[in-house]
Amino acid sequence: MMNFKFIIHPNKMFLLPIRLALIKRSCALGLWCCASLVHAQNMTGIRLTQAQIQDIEIFGHDDNSIGSSESASKGVISSEMLVSRALLRPAELLEYIPGMVVTQHSGDGKANQYFLRGINLDHGTDFATSLNGMPINMPTHAHGQGYSDLNFLIPELVQQVEYKKGPYYAQSGDFSSAGSAHIAYRTRLKEPFAELSVGLHGYQRAVAANSTTLGEDLHLITALERMNNNGPWSNPEGLRKTNALLALSQGSKNNGWSNFFSAYQAHWNSTDQIPSRLLTEGQYQGQAFGLFDAVDPSDGAQTNRYSLSGEWQNLNKTHIDKINWYSIYSDLRIFSNFTYFTDPVKRPYGDQFEQFERRNTLGGALSRSWLSDDRGTYAYINTLGLQLRQDFIRLGLNNTAQRKVMQNVRDDQVKQLQIGLFAENEVYWLEWLKTIAGLRLDQFDFQVNSFLLSQNSGVARSMKMSPKLSLILGPWHKTEFFFNHGQGFHSNDARGVTAKFDPVTQQAVSPVPGLTSSMGQELGLKTQAFKNLQSSLAIWRLNFASELFYNGETGTTQAGRPSERKGLEMAHHWTPSDQLQIDAALAWTRARYANNDPAGHFIPNAVDKVANLSLAVRNTRSWSGSLGVRYIGAAALIENNAVRSAPSVTTNLRIAKKINPQTDITLDLLNVLNRHNNDIAYFYNSRLNGEALSGVEDLHLHPSELRTFRLGTKIKF
């Protein structure tokens, strides 16, 4: 019997009779046919009681079936999928999202490099992430706008990941133009566990978690993680990471509350991207130089993150109420050197710089959804919500040498307030026709106090109204069609919004807008027309009024030219048997600047093709495993497309053996084919000691790790 899971979204719970009626026509499974009797009863005036509503929960695999989405590119990844693959880094959980790529261009303690829909998202510029309702992206961040550090995630505790693509959702605000991922932790465990893993290059990881019931329906989870890793680098990474979690909850997801406390600390050495000319020459300053060597071995960072967050939800016959809140403290000191010695007159000590920040964030959201009494045609949900966020930030930039401060460049205190108000109307006009209309209003207040250049101090306010519209048709023959249109935005760094002078050259500059608009459309379908196969297809378009791009010479994101992207995505989930699961995804993108410029129309680092293939074997007596293959296509590195990155293929393998009901052994083989890939490549000017003062335009790359393994043992108590 297939272990099938269908989780009903709480916002759609009152429309369960309609969902089941539609599914009844498209699926012959006995469970769904029985559930359709509930539809018949409701249509004749018999209503579900509150207790019955709370108890409806169908366990299974995922929530991508017909009737569960507002677009073809939306889905939910279940915990069963999340534990099946080998992961090099925690953030690679996001690679379950079709078309998403997660890499790293420096030390493994910093936020990853993300790519989706032909956008180099840098560390999160246009992809919003959240954990248990708490946003992870950081605006006006010292290292990059929208910085999204997921290294504090404990993958074993993740219950599900809900993902959306495009600016079509009224609940999604800043940084969500390309998409968003909403990660949910478990609030209870089936059984406590302890896991120990070891691998090459000094890799060691230990994680333990316990679940306790305190009184009636009160649940406590405690978890602790410790990880050490040196990586393949000649200058050992020395990553030391400590992670702790407390979770207290009561009730169910639909009627209950949960509170989370998280603490995370990490420090590491970084091997930043290196110039390809050094690899050709094979030596630097009389010493041999190879792929995993560092030009400046003093690069590195340390970070801390502490958070308190909570969620509460109440569902009854007439409405759904939701409240979430969060308080976050974080800090970061990161030392980088991407250009080495470009100005030996002004900076004889080299180009290393420090980006630092300390941040306190307070925020929350509340919403109410009104449910119609009519359970048939013209049934509706009306939702009104409010989101608030206040950031208090001290951040800056210093020129450094060997991590010693040589010159202060920027030192600012920023207060940034975000207020978002959204409204949404969802209506079933006919049994096969549904519309979702939304409107979002955002206001950002920026207040900057510049300690080193007072002229750059100031206040500013930006507002943006973003309409949304979705049309859902079907299902017919187990196939559903979608049309989505929406406007979105990303915020820009507050320091750029109030800037009047360049802090280095003292020349006058023009401030950037506080909010930059985006607009997207999508046409797609989802189908289950073939037995045991779920498929989706999306054709999409996304325009930005200003492209955020990564500047390799400064290590920052900057506002640039307007852009236009269009593409196609396909995803398939096939379970030919109870033991075998196959997932395949393909994404193609055409990305161009939208205005005329002699430099060219190509957008640097806009990956044109991404493909993933995964095979998982499970539900056998004692063995299980998975094989994952990821393809990343080439990308233009400069605007005229004269220099391109190389495509890459990475293959990961996981083999697991159940020794007894309490003990599992897992072997992960990462990059099993030992391919020489690059995690990232840039093309820009840099200068090594002894080179001409003008420097050299060159390809700079950060290699992927070669074949490595990790052996783990998990004991359940």
What kind of region is each of these model predictions?
Residues 311-313, 320-338, 474, 480-486, ...:
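Membrane-embedded beta-barrel scaffold of Gram-negative outer-membrane proteins
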Residues 135-165, 184:
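Short acidic/polar hinge/loop motifs at secondary-structure boundaries
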Residues 198-228, 233-273, 299-320, 370, ...:
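Transmembrane beta-barrel wall of Gram-negative outer-membrane proteins
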Residues 165-170, 179-212, 229-234, 522:
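Short strand-turn segments of transmembrane beta-barrel domains in outer membranes
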Residues 59, 66, 74, 91, ...:
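Extracytoplasmic beta-strand/coil segments of soluble accessory domains associated
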Residues 251-264, 301-451, 529, 533-539, ...:
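Face-selective signature of the C-terminal outer-membrane beta-barrel domain
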Residues 489, 540, 634, 657-717:
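C-terminal beta-signal and adjacent terminal beta-strands/loops
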Residues 367-371, 443, 536-545, 559-639, ...:
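Gram-negative outer-membrane beta-barrel transporters
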